[in-house]
């Protein structure tokens, strides 16, 4: 199995247990990048959409590219009726965006799954002049009070 799809096999658990990002992070990004109506945004690998709502709610022209079929199904149920929402269920590495360019490309703990030359080379090509790449990462070592649970969590990460 492609290691990039490990969480797509457990989308409900991923959505339930995944650590969420702070609202302050998105407030800063929205303000700093000037995200709003008329701004073209691409999210790399949105998963279940934990970093989608604050950006999508600005009214920007939002596109997501998600490799996982299960994640894509969840995303379409959540956002498919939104006028400013576009989902591409494909591999960012090989997807042809044609002439489309973006003001902002962002990745919430996804870009590290891509080879560096592609991650940075392709995003640079897809950005409009003066565009911005924003990368968000989660940092920490979750320690459960239950050693058995912690061991089981580590098994998932080791896959």
Explain the meaning of each model-derived region.
Residues 118-129:
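A short glycine-rich, Lys/Arg-flanked "PGG" loop and its adjoining helix->strand segment in the class I
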Residues 95-105:
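A short acidic, Gly/Pro-enriched loop at the edge of an enzyme's catalytic core
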Residues 1-36:
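Conserved class I S-adenosyl-L-methionine
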Residues 42, 48-94:
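Class I SAM-dependent methyltransferase SAM/SAH-binding core
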Residues 128-159:
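Conserved catalytic/acceptor-binding region of the Class I
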Residues 38-39, 100:
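Nucleotide donor/acceptor-binding cores
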């Amino acid at each position: 199995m492609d290691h990039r799809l490990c969480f797509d096999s457990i989308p409900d658990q991923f959505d339930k247990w995944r650590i969420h990002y702070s609202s302050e992070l998105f407030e800063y990004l929205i303000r700093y990048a000037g995200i709003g109506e008329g701004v073209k945004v691409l999210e790399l690998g949105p998963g279940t959409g934990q970093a989608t709502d604050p950006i999508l709610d600005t009214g920007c022209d939002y596109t997501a590219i998600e490799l996982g079929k299960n994640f894509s199904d969840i995303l379409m149920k959540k956002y498919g009726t939104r006028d400013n929402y576009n989902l591409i269920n494909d591999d960012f590495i090989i997807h042809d965006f044609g002439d489309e360019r973006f003001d902002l490309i962002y990745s919430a703990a996804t870009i590290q799954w891509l080879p560096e030359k592609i991650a940075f080379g392709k995003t640079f090509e897809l950005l409009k002049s003066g565009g911005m790449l924003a990368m968000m990462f989660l940092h920490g070592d979750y320690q459960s009070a239950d050693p058995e649970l912690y061991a089981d969590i580590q098994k998932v990460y080791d896959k």
